[in-house]
From Swiss-Prot:
Predominant cellular place of this UniProt entry's protein: endoplasmic reticulum
Protein name: Fatty acyl-CoA reductase 3
Homology family: Belongs to the fatty acyl-CoA reductase family.
Tissue expression from the record: Expressed in leaves, stems, flowers, siliques and roots. Detected in epidermal cells of leaves and stems, in trichomes and in the elongation zone of young roots.
Location(s), subcellular: Endoplasmic reticulum
Recorded superkingdom: Eukaryota
Organism field: Arabidopsis thaliana
GO biological process: wax biosynthetic process
Record bears the keyword Iron-sulfur: no
Length: 493
């Protein structure tokens, strides 16, 4: 990265630019598109890569599933009846698939247009399930990343590729985690032999074996999930998601040639802080399900180290960092990594979550389906895996063993009940196993590169207010109590 401090104008950069957005149906991508349409009307074109779904074309998906979201209400208020004209002029829907070579483009004329018109590509496509099927995660997060890069290389005018990854490609590292790239084949535990081509071959061979024996769809899914977790843990990553995202980084980082590349690593992404309005969110994250589960009276304990730092970042700040990094790095023919998080400059301990959940639901208690107000009480904190196992044993496992014994004595009279509770408890243990690395995470994400990026835009006055992403401005109590939880309850739960 250049040592000379520059001043970046995002609006000037976006003027007359054509941008390909990959993974356009996703949470961040929607906010990215809305932001550009709202603040940069002089952008030339946004090409949105979407897959057609059963019974719906890519264009129908955009109109029915994306544009009708509350997220776009500010844009609708701004443009009124002219919004349709704006979207028809500025947006081109591209029917494609990141998992396929050339992004699965079937429209030759459109592909030709994009190859000669696109100035920048932002890859926001990802499957974020920790235990996703290995074939699916590898196809999207790893090989899909390569497909996007290869398409970028074909584009005559492309000056920048922004690949959005995750800060947690670091696995379970502790201490200060630097903004450094992965070498091809690098592993977290030193185990040698990581070969992405072999991983691809392994997946295909396993799928072929399952199909030959006529395995049921459920068996194929579970086998693929287990394979992904095994391969991830073999090389030191805690789950399939971060393992395949790390391999995706390896792919684009080592094969980019002279293309300018931004690897943007956000931490845990939460609801919008300010724009287009506070509290917009989609999907369920660990901290969200814990807080709301407690408020609904379904959760009586939290499992985490209260003194560990939780790194969260509002979605609009992440989108702003993407826009600024794109403008700052276009045409520089280098690779740079940005951690976009809060743990270094505005750390928040895990202890905040149970405290704020109690404060919120004490003042605004949840009303259940029967119309009864759910009163919350003090929550039990399990500060280690040992205390969790002890809690589960006393509260559930002893009773389950008793039920199993009675079931055997009475010739499986209670088999249905036993299987139900056994499955439920096993599911809890599986969830805890998946999330444990983040409930007891002891890393702090260095963001030296990102801080330089903030300084570049901070000198531009109006744009500093427009493209904010400094975590130091966040008051965590105010954000969670008056923005995030309200958004969760309105849009998700």
């Amino acid at each position: 990265m250049s040592t000379e401090m520059e001043v970046v104008s995002v609006l000037k950069y976006l003027d007359n630019k054509s941008i390909l957005v990959v993974g356009a149906a996703g949470f961040l991508a929607n906010i990215f598109v809305e932001k550009i349409l709202r603040v940069a009307p002089n952008v030339k074109k946004l090409y949105l890569l979407l897959r057609a779904s059963k019974g719906k074309s890519a264009t129908q998906r955009f109109n029915d599933e994306i544009l009708k979201k509350d997220l776009f209400k500010v844009l609708k208020e701004k443009y009124g009846p002219n919004l349709n004209q704006l979207t028809s002029e500025k947006i081109t829907i591209v029917d494609g698939d990141i998992c396929l070579e050339d992004l699965g483009l079937q429209d030759f004329d459109l592909a030709h247009e994009m190859i000669h018109q696109v100035d920048a590509i932002v890859n926001l496509a990802a499957t974020t399930k920790f235990d996703e099927r290995y074939d699916v995660a590898l196809g999207i997060n790893t090989l899909g990343a390569l497909n996007v890069l290869n398409f970028a290389k074909r584009c005559a005018k492309v000056k920048i590729l922004v690949h959005v990854s995750t800060a947690y490609v670091c696995g379970e590292k502790s201490g200060l985690i630097m903004e450094t790239p992965y070498r091809m084949g690098e592993t977290l535990n030193g185990t040698t032999g990581l070969d992405i081509n072999y991983e691809k071959k392994l997946v295909q061979e396993k799928l072929d074996q399952l199909r030959v024996i006529g395995a049921a769809p459920e068996t194929i899914t579970e086998t693929m999930k287990d394979l992904g977790l095994r391969r991830a843990k073999m090389y030191g990553w805690p789950n399939t998601y971060v393992f395949t995202k790390a391999m995706g980084e390896m792919m684009v980082g080592t094969k980019r040639e002279n293309l300018s590349l931004v690897l943007l690593r956000p931490s845990i992404i939460t609801s919008t802080f300010k724009e287009p309005f506070p509290g917009w969110t989609e999907g369920i994250r660990t901290i969200d399900s814990l807080a709301v589960g407690y408020g609904k009276g379904k959760l009586t304990c939290f499992l985490c180290d209260l003194d560990a730092v939780s790194d969260v970042m509002p979605a609009d700040m992440v989108v702003n960092s993407i826009l600024v990094s794109m403008a700052a790095q276009a045409g520089k023919q280098e690779e740079i990594i940005y951690h976009v998080g809060s743990s270094l400059r505005n750390p928040m301990k895990n202890s905040k979550f149970p405290e704020l959940a109690y404060r919120y639901f004490s003042i605004k208690p949840w009303t259940n389906k029967e119309g009864k107000v759910v009163k919350v009480g003090a929550i039990e904190i399990l500060s280690s895996m040992r205390s969790f196992h002890r809690y589960m044993t006393i509260r559930y496992l002893i009773a389950l063993k008793g039920l199993e014994l009675v079931n055997i004595i009475l010739c499986k009279l209670f088999e249905k009940e036993f299987q139900y509770f056994n499955k439920k408890i096993n599911f809890i243990f599986r969830l805890v196993d998946l999330y444990q690395p983040y409930l007891f995470f002891y890393g702090i994400f260095d963001d030296s590169n990102t801080e330089k990026l903030r300084k570049m835009v901070s000198k531009t006055g109006v744009e500093n207010e427009m493209f904010y992403f400094d975590p130091k401005v966040l008051d965590w109590d105010d954000y969670f109590l008056n923005t995030h939880v309200i958004g969760l309850l309105k849009y998700v739960f």
